[in-house]
Amino acid sequence: MVPLPIWKPIFAISNSIAQNLTRIESALAMVKNAGLPPAAISELSRQAKIRATHYSTRIEGNRLTLEETAEVITGRRRIFHGRERDVAEVRNYWDALTRIEEWAAKGRPVTEELIQRIAGIVLNGRRSGLAPYRDGQNVIRDSMSGGIVYMPPEAFDVPGLMGEFVRWIDQAETDEIPVVIIAALAHYQFVTIHPYYDGNGRTARLIATFILHRGGYGLNGIFTLEEYHSRDIAAYYDAMDVGEHHNYYMGRADANLTGWIEYFTGTLSDVFEAARQQALTYSNSSTIAEPDELRRLDHRARTVFALFLRQEYIKSSDVATILALSERMSRIALSEWVNDGWIIISNPSKRSRKYSLAEPLRRYIDSLKH
């Protein structure tokens, strides 16, 4: 198959977009300079990921509440009779979000393989392989009338369009197009191609989040863009509805995307401003010096450390859940952390082994509670 030319999205940097980008940069700088302690970052990130998981799946019709979503993610409740699919969607989105944060931290590029891996987790869980593109036509219908809202490109064209799509992202980064605009356009184009029968919206939002994290706009994971999309779902869908016709081949492929970028950057600027306010609140209220042992922890270790803010002991199953790992990999990670000296084995029983914080970090946790 001869590669298609690189996708050339049509848009202009309007005054609104320029102002939004300025607000985003300002909030980003303030959060970076807020001096948030790692413990606060870990807890804020955990809360944001739970909200992101809830609201992104809710957009697609998931029936679990925010509290129920948190129960599924933390393992406090695993079964909701009659809502098994909702539970699986929440679990899978959390796992995918955990993975993209790790991949972004490693600087992995956007490739078709990465996208197919994200989609695989969204659709079938963390042990899934690459998700193949659809092999037939799909349509998006109005949930009330049943009428066709959008008809994506034919399955035959999907591989070529996806190849063109990832090449554009690579070229856009080379051309130093602002990261936020790349994320906005990536979100739009993935949904436009609609390469899967299901999970396109969730995967598109994850791709946009990955690009933001990878490009330095991750804010340590303390923001929730999905929540703001969900607050006004009509505005979200209206902003993406830029074509004059519901058929991909009759206008949407060549649509002007300035309006969508205005929506995306405006929403993100509101999200970043909320994160800035939250960061300042935590920074001003935190006067206790953090121990060196805590500052040396990497991202995964800090995520696990945050568990001790709510419980005295943890088990390998807790680590497996929060980091989207297998039980075996969680035990390996715990063994490494025991050797590093920041956690200790409290109950050596192989069947019910428990871990707690080493003394310096336990004292720090205790000081936060008084």
What is each model feature region?
Residues 1-370:
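FIC/Doc superfamily catalytic core
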